[in-house]
Regions:
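Extreme N-terminal basic, low-complexity initiation segments
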Residues: 1-14, 21-22, 26, 36
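Short, Lys/Arg-enriched N-terminal segments with co-localized hydrophobic residues
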Residues: 41, 49-69
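Short glycine/serine/threonine-rich phosphate/pyrophosphate-binding segments
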Residues: 84, 137-142, 251-256
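ATP/nucleoside-binding phosphotransfer catalytic cores, i.e., glycine-rich phosphate-binding loops
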Residues: 214, 230-233, 279-353
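Gly/Ser/Thr-rich active-site loops/lids in small-molecule metabolic enzymes
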Residues: 235-239, 244-280
């Protein structure tokens, strides 16, 4: 694996009452001016000669990883989308010419008469790379089934907004060429684990890439959710519900509810209230190692937990929803042609009048 070159150590001394602070930093260069794996090393020098203390370096952003050799590629497509089927046929021919073995999701393999196929929930055991043709919803569904974090996902946008499926049709084959040459990098995204506990028994467990949403299902009534972080009481949310999202999900429902945009490679958990009755309830960002718990204190039973907008379960009064960081990540292929901030500018139309 090619290692990023290290820039020279920069030493800077600032005068101070205690004899000054000498700072040295060694950084790894990254694309577009972003310093991946950047760390700072501080040496505090005392007026007494021969004594100093060191603050250990802290990584600000996780390093990107290069993709290893790819010989088996899986393709997952959005069902009943003709352009996705046509593109899959075209990709299979292109990849076969390069001696790449292609696996299709069993649910759609028969429709284009292709073999071999593999159930989506087992795809991570069959392939070195998963290509998703569709929108963010298709990618979210595929990511939930990826058991092995070593298998990266390349999302190709055939849908609408496409925050997760960041590769365009025009970029698809140039990116695939780079993948086969080992010249692209992956970025790990954290997932959440959500559990529903009813009368002391776990009745449901879920993997979450974007967000977990606790909300009223039908009737327009205020629901009460008692919240705690690591066992410490935070507040009781009164409103339409609450969104618990990953940094990846911060540009989804949470953003529409007034939450901030969180850089997707960060490890943190975002809690965003939905239409809170108490106007001082604001979004809350907590560390990724924290466990957050919500207890439904509403007597009505028309409240639902929804995961990534696709699966979920009905909640009963006094059910507890416990959420923490999942053990495994999801790896995405990074676009070599644009960075995250270019994607934000394009998708959110920043600067347009």
């Amino acid at each position: 694996m090619r290692k990023p070159s290290l820039l020279p150590i920069i030493t800077e001394k600032t005068p101070g009452a205690a004899g000054g602070i000498q700072r040295a930093k060694q950084i790894q260069g990254g694309p577009a001016g972003i310093l991946y794996g950047q760390s700072f090393h501080f040496v505090i020098k005392s007026p007494n000669k021969g004594t100093e203390s060191t603050i250990q370096p802290r990584r600000l952003l996780p390093p990107l990883k290069e993709v290893s050799v790819v010989s088996r590629i899986g393709i997952v497509i959005k069902p009943n989308k003709p352009e996705a089927l046509a593109l899959a046929r075209e990709m299979i021919g292109w990849l076969n010419q390069k001696n790449i073995r292609v696996y299709l999701d069993t649910a759609v393999a028969a429709s284009i008469h292709h073999a071999p196929s593999c159930p989506q929930e087992e795809m991570s055991k069959c392939v070195d790379l998963l290509v998703v043709l569709g929108g963010d919803g298709t990618l979210l569904s595929a990511a939930r089934h990826m058991e092995e974090e070593e298998v990266p996902i390349l999302g190709v946008n055939l849908g609408g907004l496409g925050f997760l499926t960041e590769i365009t049709l025009e970029e698809l084959y140039p990116v695939l060429e780079r993948v086969l040459e080992g010249k692209v990098e992956t970025e790990k995204r954290m997932k959440l684990h959500a559990a529903v506990i009813r009368q002391g028994r776990t009745v449901g467990e879920y993997a979450v890439l974007n967000d977990a949403v606790i909300s009223k299902s039908i009737l327009a009534r205020i629901i009460h959710l008692r919240s705690s972080v690591n066992g410490a009481y935070v507040t009781t949310y009164r409103g339409d519900g609450v969104i618990i999202s990953t940094p990846t999900g911060s540009t989804a429902y949470s953003l529409a509810a007034g939450g901030p945009i969180v850089y997707p490679a960060m490890d943190s958990v975002l809690i965003t209230p939905i239409c809170p009755h108490t106007l001082t309830n604001r979004p809350l960002l907590i560390p990724d190692e924290a466990t957050v718990e919500f207890t439904l204190e509403t007597e009505e039973s028309d409240v639902r937990l929804t995961l990534d907008g696709q699966v979920g379960c009905d909640l009963l009064p006094f059910d507890r929803v416990v959420i923490h960081k999942a053990q495994k990540h999801v790896s995405f292929i990074k676009s070599p042609f644009k960075d995250y901030f270019q994607i934000l500018r394009t998708k959110l139309k920043w600067g347009e009048r």
